[in-house]
Amino acid sequence: YKNDKIEDVSQVYNGSRVIEGTESKHIDLIYSSDGIKKNILPNLTDPLANENFIFRNDQKSVLATYDPFANKIIRVNKTEAYGISPRNAEQSFALQILLDQRIQLVSLSGKAGTGKTLLALASALQSRKSYKQIFLARPIVPLSNRDLGFLPGDIQSKLDPYMQPLYDNLSVIRHQLKANTKRIRQINEMLEQEKLNITPL
């Protein structure tokens, strides 16, 4: 994993495109319908499965995604998962895809602190009834056995500092749910029953 290098960052798929100059009637149609055929949009070329778009002009804009199952461009609604709401377009796109049960694997990339883990955890909790167990994992590749040996305490004590960001995300969700004791109780029960398992990779 240390040897691969990206030669041209602009060639990396970032999951979304901004489509400028979209006619207002098409933006209104995306807003008012349950999806439109991709060929209705003349300035849209070769959408990829689950690719996200910001269609806009000088007056208005709409967030949308290409649904390969319906073969349509559909509106991305601002939604929430376990008390967590998206704060920008990218988080709205991520949450929509994470909550879509038809999509088996979602890969999120971005800078530290952009909400990737938080959104993934909130979406998993929101969809908990669809799964027997949720694993929240963090790779400890930078820690060799030699590094671990120099750290004080047992194995759990050695790993705790590296796992803390995952617990921090869970704390954020709990804080958002402070008025909803039922959901907080559900989280505690999932942890006790190991239905929510926070573990190193």
Spans of features found by a protein language model:
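Active-site lining segments that contact anionic ligands and/or coordinate catalytic metals
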Residues: 103, 131, 193
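Conserved glycine(s) of the Walker
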Residues: 113-115
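Conserved RecA-like ASCE ATPase "motif II neighborhood" in helicase/translocase motors
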Residues: 190-201
